[in-house]
Amino acid sequence: MKIATVLDLIDIGSMALPEFQRGYVWNREQVRGLMHSLYKKHPVGSLLIWVTKTETAETRGDGALPPGTVKLLLDGQQRITSLYGIIRGRPPKFFDGNAEAFTGLHFHLDDEVFEFYSPTKMKDNPLWINVTELMQIGSGKAIERLVKIPELAPNLSDYINRLNAIDSIKQIELHGEE
């Protein structure tokens, strides 16, 4: 199942978190590591999903569930919550934890590293890209900014490839056991 599909299922309430699951406990280092692994196309584990009847499902959060069945995320919650927060720019409906763990992630186009926003390091540096902004609006706006800076021209094709690689993380297939 593609990452984008999982996030869409959460948005419409067809995938939820069972009430017995713990809250979100990941820290920024774990989130950064996840994004680095996905960027490098390394495996990040599978999802364990329990399909059950909506009327008997006890879930976290206040999101409405669809009639019929719902997919409950039994394993993979920390990864999916992190990805949801980075890609959507907000926590999912079932969120219980510290949203700072996935807020403000940036990527450096030369060094190919993910780091969380630091104004002294990143402000006014066009090589630091806001990952959430990139995921939400695509690479076009970032490319437009880079094209206007003549000294970046020699590396522009590499930068475009890296931007597209990050944006394509949404299309990565995660193995899901149902």
Predicted regions and their residues:
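Basic- and aromatic-enriched surface patches that contact anionic nucleotides/nucleic acids
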Residues: 2-178
